[in-house]
Design a protein with these regions (language model features):
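Non-catalytic terminal regions of proteins
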Residues: 112, 116-322
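Non-membrane alpha-helical secondary structure
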Residues: 8-15, 30-31, 95, 99, ...
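Active-site-proximal alpha-helical
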Residues: 51-149
Length: 322
């Protein structure tokens, strides 16, 4: 997800503010007008984003966001309290718990049948339904001032710059920890994401992600779990896609107090250390030490595949909230 783009963050901040004003509007015309401004900001933002990132945002609003909306209804809470200064560049996941219910509340105002449309699968996202339902005659007459736009732009520039600086510092601190380092290189058999905590992870840019609580991976060669310690993953896909969903090519743990316990039984290798376990088939274990002692886990190269064979793919992802 492109978190470090100041223009995208500017659009997201203006969209959130427009939603705040729509929810606060006492009458239908004001709500329709500011909801329209929010959807305009969203369309412009989504047009500049990778399709996978757009789908990620819509999917989470439709699932996590609607779950929050239903919880608000059950507890008789009023409209969601969206932050006046918007959401930060690295709080995309957090934002869906406010923006999703906000879109649902506005749909309640403009389309009494929207829940039926969602249940029937005729809408891909809450924002798409709202865009269709807004009355054109009531959607004009409000806009952000030039000063408001410039203020949002300046703040987004500062926030994304801080994000990039913080990422570099966190990555450097991870690799600077004294102690043993464990590196697992999956090679041509990427490790599939089976469990993770989306609220306790940090995208470092490119295909690197720093996991701060939970990570579960597996492939046709075994399984591994990291719990209550940090681990850094490098995704198998270095393009514009999600850095985890194509699988993990390399996993690194740093700052281990001692070498992991490694036991073998036939072709199976079991690796254990504080906060980490792995059971792997056919793995090779190599220890090197040039300043930092590194335990490297690899596999022998695959034999040449037969003609027409399909390369291995990583299993599908699951989060700890599934």
């Amino acid at each position: 997800y492109p978190m470090d783009d100041p223009d995208l963050l500017t659009g997201r901040r203006l969209e959130t503010e427009a939603l705040r004003r729509a929810l606060a509007a006492p009458g239908r015309p004001g709500a329709a007008c500011w909801a329209s401004r929010a959807m305009e900001q969203r369309r412009a933002r989504f047009a500049r984003m990778p399709a996978g990132s757009v789908g990620y945002e819509r999917w989470n609003e439709l699932n996590e966001g609607l779950a929050s909306y239903l919880e608000d209804l059950a507890q008789e809470r009023h409209a969601p309290d969206l932050p006046a200064d918007g959401y930060g560049p690295d709080t995309v996941r957090t934002a869906v718990y406010g923006v999703g219910p906000a879109l649902a509340d506005l749909l309640d105002r403009f389309d009494s049948a929207w829940k039926t449309k969602i249940d029937s699968g005729t809408a891909a996202g809450l924002d798409q339904l709202l865009t269709v339902d807004l009355p054109l005659a009531e959607s004009a007459g409000c806009s952000f001032t030039a000063e408001e736009k410039e203020r949002a732009r300046a703040q987004a520039g500062e926030d994304t710059a801080k994000l990039v600086t913080g990422r570099k510092a966190d990555r450097a601190a991870f690799f600077a920890r004294p102690g043993v380092r464990l590196v697992i290189e999956a090679g041509s058999h990427p490790l599939g994401l089976q469990g993770f905590d989306p609220l306790n992870m940090e995208a470092l840019g490119g295909s690197e992600v720093l996991h701060k609580r939970l990570l579960q991976l597996s492939n046709d060669r075994g399984t591994l779990e990291v719990f209550n310690r940090e681990a850094l993953t490098e995704g198998a896909d270095a393009g514009d896609h999600h850095p985890l969903f194509a699988g993990v090519r390399t996993l690194t743990l740093s700052g281990l107090a001692a070498e992991p316990k490694v036991t073998r039984e036939g072709e199976t290798v079991k690796i254990e250390t504080e906060g980490f376990t792995a059971t792997l088939k056919g793995a090779l274990v190599e220890t090197t030490g040039n300043g930092v002692r590194i335990i490297r886990i690899t596999w022998p190269p695959d034999p040449p595949p037969p003609a027409g064979a399909t390369p291995p793919t990583a299993p599908g992802p699951h989060s700890s909230t599934d």
